[in-house]
Each structure stands twice: as structure tokens, then as C-alpha cells.
UniProtKB/Swiss-Prot annotation:
PROSITE patterns from the UniProt entry: GATASE_TYPE_1 (PS51273), GMPS_ATP_PPASE (PS51553)
Gene: guaA
UniProt-recorded name of the protein: Probable GMP synthase [glutamine-hydrolyzing]
Catalytic activity, reaction form: XMP + L-glutamine + ATP + H2O = GMP + L-glutamate + AMP + diphosphate + 2 H(+)
InterPro entries the record matches: Class_I_gatase-like, GATASE, GMP_synth_C, GMP_synth_GATase, GMPS_ATP_PPase_dom, NAD/GMP_synthase, Rossmann-like_a/b/a_fold
């Protein structure tokens, strides 16, 4: 399908480039991703250009840039975060390191009466999502300030005559109130007609699969039972016919309680017939004494390939005629450093070196790799899956192994004193640094830092959100904040690192806790109100062999940003009572961290 009116998104390697494209598509305009090194003739083909965010600083040597000739094309241009700063620098403005940085929610304030078409239907006070360590301190000639935030003097700027705009916040994420309104305003400025929808993606993707996969080739599809792999499997079956796609499920020993049997029943109902292999002993053996999150993910990814190879041999399949199918979605690739300028936040199990080599050899097919979770769900419904099915909580491909933390990381006395000093101004709140670390993301870069636990004086959620956001923004050694529900005095508790083995005993413990939590939220009718709720096992207790559980309920749409779910106290209390009935569980924590700075999963 030839589309003459479209918007280019120039990728500078941030987490958000493809998300921008996705959001524009959902607003009914077609988008394509371009590199920042395209010839000027390529940029000239578009009705509008968006310069994405990125993990670099525009003043760093060799940081990615773009030709200044794009500003002479007469095409509307929107810069977002890094893209905004790059426009300012290239046209004569000044960008410097910010004094504090800005991560998470901020309030957008309009500047005087400088109304502008890019902010049509904005009234001021809208929440926007920030994720930056640099800021613009001087505008180029011809630009004016349109809006600002508490910590950002130039949150929105414009050169109205040239239709060039810059915004410091991320309008493309769901947590920016009216973000879609701003993007739709830009679409209107570009004069782009509504030419895109998920139904068109389906038609184009089926055609692409049929043209890409040779007639003699078949697909070996790794199905976890999650939404992504299931939708991928159905899409491949629709494009190629079910006889050319083999669904294969590996029981790793790190699946949820009764998952394999449940999945077989549910997928059979959808006419999906799986071959199941129990490889739990191999996974337990290979992960013994392992703790580093990157190493764990890479081991899991390689074990999946080993299991696949054995299955190919045992099933007497012609290896050369088979492609590996994966349910990879875009956040998996971008968090694994999947674009030229991106930083690795975490290596996903389907992006380990062995699989990367297969991808380079053309032996992997990933039919939904450019989609986000919300789009995958829409596609699933279009393919005939029930809404209840596609609405299930996301579950990581490696399973519970990424929800079992094993790395000890003690905070320093100096760090604790800094935390104490800040919290002393917060009306009775106190905190302790837990001796563990988790993966997070700050300014599009991976962070691996400590977690702080706060006491509970039944402070309202908004105040806890503010304090948690401030802690993770202000202190570089913190990227996650949790609450110890219904416990006002932390001094009486001794949070010791007790160690963790990725074995059947610990996975059974987490399986039981996970099942307990899900049972409560389903009983109370909350399951569909929470986007995802990882239940995490921590090696924290007072005695040897004791562990702790973290509740991580979040609200999100696309997994690129998220905020913690404000749970009713009565619900939290019921969950705590039920979970602490499990003998080995000593503490129950509640995660107060937004994304950024913390990833949804702890590893």
C-alpha cells in the first residue's frame, strides 16, 4: 500500500522513538522510523518530521545529530526531549546539564498569552511526563517560550512562522495528560490525513510474512502462553496455515502455579495445539548460584535455544527448513539496546547473542516486533481472541526467574544519612536502604541501584508518590522506593540479606505467593483494573531462609511508562494477611516507584 502523506520519526536511540510512531498511528496517521543519517532527499518525502528522545547529551562529543538542512525544507518539525534540545543547539540556542534533572510527573504551565497551535485545547496545569538530565537555558533566534514546568523553564517552545516546535516532556507516553492532543495538533499542522489502523497493519503484515517465508519453510514458534507469543502464533497461522507452524512450550520450572495445564486447556479452546517439554531440571541446574540479572537472562535465552534444538532432533524435523518464531514486541528490542544509539537497560531472553546471530542469518521471524502491548491486544481481538484472553496481565518470557532477586548491594552510611536528612522534613516518614539492587532506567540509560523502604503512617498515596519520586530523582544511588504497609516504626525491624537460590524450593515459594495475591485481587474484582502486578521474591528477612514479597501493581498502556496502582488500604491489608500466612515469608512490601526510574519488572 502506497501512502503519500506520512510522518517521519527520526530515531536517536531513546526508549521512545517507536512509541512516538505507535501513538501517531493510533491517531490515524502513518509513520515510518528513519535514522538520523538519512540523505536530505529522504526527509523531503514526508509531511512532517519528529525528532525523538535519546540517551545522549547534545553537547557530548560524537552525540547523534541531524543535518541542519531539514530546517530549510518547509516541513513542520517537532522535537521531543533530546530532539527538542538538538533543535535548540543546532539553531543557536544553549543546552546545559540540569541542576536536578526531572524524572516522572510535572505540571505544565502556559506562558502568558503566547497561545500556539501546538498547544491547542491546553489550559495549563496538565500533567506531563519528564525524563531528562539536561535542559535548554537559551532559545535560538525566532523561538518563543510557550510553556514551562517547575524545574524546566522551556518545556514547550515554538517558531510559529517556520512551524518548528520543541517539547521537553514525552507527549507520546500515556502518563502525559493531553499528550495525544498535542500529537494530534502536530498531525493537523502537518496536514496528514487519517490513513492508518491496526486492520491495515494486519493486512500488510500477512502480505509481508507470505512474501518473506519461503514456500518450503516452516515456523518453530516458542509459545509461553502469554499474549505476545499467542497473538504471534495466531498471526503466523493465519498467514501461512496452521500446518506450517509448530507451537512449542517449554516448562522452565519458573512458570506460575498450574500454568502449563491451564494454558493447554485455554489454547486448545483456541484451536492451538502445543507440544510441551519439561526442562525444569536443566534450568534449575544451569541457574544454580547465579545472581547477576544480565547473566540470568542470557542463560535463560540460551537454554530456550538448547531445548529447541533437542526438540528439533527428537521430533525428527528438518532443521534447515525451520525458522524460529518469537513473540518479541518493541519494548523488548529497545530495552535490549536494539537501535544504533540506544543504551541497554536489560537484555531480554529473546535478545541474547545466540538469538541475535540467528536474526542476522535470517532464521528468526518476529511478526509483532514493531507493536506495543496495547496494539498487540487490539490485534489479538482482530484475530478472534476473546477480550478476557488478551487482557491478561503481561508475564515475562523468562518467567519467575526475573522476579527472584539474588544480588546483595549494601547502602553506605553516608547514603543512609542523606536519606535520613531528607525524610526528616517529611512529617514522620522514615526510611532504610535495603541491601539489594534492582534494574531501573534514568534518562533512557540503565541504572542498577538500591531500594529504600519507607515506614507507613497511613500517608495518602499522592504524598507517598511525591516522596518516592523525589527520592529517586534526587539520589543517584536510589531507583526504587517501597512501603512497609501498616508498620510505623522501622527501627524494630532488621532487614537482613538472607540469600536466594534459583531452585525449585524458592520458585515454589514465589509461585504460592503469586497465586495467593492473584486470588485476592480476582476475588475483589481488581484484576482488570490493574495493568500488571508482578509479585517479587526478595532475599530479605530477619533469620536465615526467610524471604520477603514485593507487590508491584502498576497502571500503564504500553509498558514504556507506568505509575504504581493506588490500592485501597483494606485490599492491601487482606493481601498482607494472606501472604504472611506462608511460613517462609517475613515481610510484605508495596512498590511506590513509577517508570521511570524503575522498570516494571525488578530485573
Amino acid at each position: 500500500m502506497v501512502i503519500h502523506k506520512k510522518i517521519a520519526v527520526v530515531d536517536f536511540g531513546g526508549q521512545y522513538a517507536h512509541l512516538i510512531a505507535s501513538r501517531i498511528r493510533r491517531l490515524g496517521a502513518y509513520t515510518e522510523i528513519l535514522s538520523n543519517e538519512e540523505p536530505i532527499s529522504n526527509y523531503q518525502k514526508y509531511s512532517g518530521i519528529i525528532l525523538s528522545g535519546g540517551p545522549e547529551s547534545v553537547y557530548e562529543p560524537n552525540s547523534p545529530t541531524v543535518t541542519t538542512r531539514i530546517f530549510d525544507l518547509g516541513i513542520p518539525i517537532l522535537g521531543i526531549c533530546y530532539g527538542h534540545q538538538l533543535i535548540m543547539k543546532l539553531l543557536g540556542g544553549v543546552v546545559e546539564r540540569s541542576g536536578t534533572g526531572e524524572y516522572g510527573p510535572a505540571s505544565l504551565q502556559l506562558h502568558g498569552t503566547n497561545g500556539n497551535s501546538i498547544l491547542k485545547n491546553f489550559v495549563g496545569g496538565e500533567q506531563v511526563w519528564m525524563n531528562h538530565a539536561d535542559e535548554v537555558v537559551k532559545l535560538p533566534e525566532g523561538f518563543s517560550k510557550i510553556a514551562f514546568s517547575k524545574d524546566c523553564g522551556y518545556a514547550v517552545v515554538a517558531n510559529s512562522s517556520k512551524k518548528i516546535f520543541g517539547i521537553q516532556f514525552h507527549a507520546e507516553v500515556s502518563h502525559s495528560e493531553k499528550g495525544s492532543v498535542l500529537l494530534d495538533n502536530f498531525i493537523q499542522i502537518c496536514g496528514v490525513s487519517k490513513t492508518w489502523g491496526i486492520d491495515q497493519f494486519l493486512k500488510e503484515k500477512i502480505k509481508e510474512i507470505q512474501e518473506t517465508v519461503k514456500q518450503e519453510q516452516k515456523i518453530f514458534m516458542l509459545v509461553s502462553g502469554g499474549v505476545d507469543s499467542t497473538v504471534s502464533y495466531l498471526l503466523l497461522c493465519k498467514a501461512l496455515g496452521a500446518e506450517r507452524v509448530l507451537g512449542f512450550l517449554i516448562d522452565t520450572g519458573f512458570m506460575r502455579k498450574d500454568e502449563v495445564v491451564s494454558l493447554q486447556k485455554k489454547l486448545t479452546f483456541q484451536n492451538i495445539h502445543l507440544t510441551v517439554r519439561d526442562e525444569s531440571s536443566l534450568f534449575y541446574k544451569s541457574l544454580k548460584d547465579k545472581s547477576d540479572p544480565e547473566e540470568k537472562r542470557k542463560i535463560v535465552g540460551n537454554l530456550f535455544l538448547e531445548a529447541r534444538d533437542r526438540a528439533v532432533k527428537d521430533l525428527d524435523l528438518e532443521y534447515g527448513d525451520w525458522l524460529l518464531g518469537q513473540g518479541t514486541i518493541y519494548p523488548d528490542t529497545i530495552e535490549s539496546g536494539g537501535t544504533k544509539h540506544s543504551h541497554t537497560i536489560k537484555t531480554h531472553h529473546n535478545r541474547v547473542e545466540a538469538i541475535q546471530k540467528l536474526i542476522e542469518q535470517g532464521k528468526v521471524i518476529e511478526p509483532i516486533r514493531d507493536l506495543y502491548k496495547d496494539e498487540v491486544r487490539d490485534l489479538g481481538v482482530l484475530l478472534g481472541l476473546e477480550s478476557e484472553w488478551v487482557g491478561r496481565h503481561p508475564f515475562p518470557g523468562p518467567g519467575l526467574v526475573v522476579r527472584m532477586l539474588a544480588v546483595e548491594k549494601k547502602g553506605t552510611d553516608k547514603d543512609q544519612l542523606e536519606i535520613d536528612s531528607y525524610l526528616s522534613t517529611q512529617d514522620g516518614l522514615s526510611g532504610k536502604i535495603l541491601p539489594i539492587a534492582s534494574v531501573g532506567v534514568k534518562g533512557d540509560r540503565r541504572s542498577y541501584a538500591n531500594c529504600v523502604v519507607l515506614n507507613d503512617i497511613e500517608t495518602d498515596w499522592n504524598t507517598l508518590d511525591r516522596v518516592a519520586t523525589h527520592l529517586s530523582n534526587r539520589f543517584s544511588f536510589i531507583n526504587r522506593v517501597v512501603l512497609l504497609p501498616f508498620e510505623s516504626d522501622l527501627k524494630k525491624w532488621n532487614f537482613q540479606f538472607t540469600g536466594m537460590q534459583l531452585d525449585k524450593k524458592c520458585s515454589d515459594l514465589l509461585r504460592e505467593a503469586d497465586f495467593t495475591v492473584e486470588s485476592v485481587i480476582r476475588k475483589l474484582g481488581l484484576y482488570n483494573k490493574i495493568w500488571q502486578m508482578p509479585v517479587v521474591l526478595l532475599p530479605i528477612g530477619e533469620k536465615e531462609n526467610e524471604k520477603s514479597i514485593v507487590l508491584r501493581p502498576v497502571e500503564s498502556q504500553e509498558a514504556m511508562t507506568a505509575n504504581f496502582f493506588r490500592m485501597e488500604r483494606s485490599v492491601l491489608q487482606e493481601i498482607k494477611i494472606e501472604v504472611l500466612k506462608i511460613p517462609e515469608i517475613r515481610y510484605l512490601f508495596f512498590d511506590l516507584t513509577n517508570k521511570p526510574p524503575g522498570t516494571i519488572e525488578w530485573e
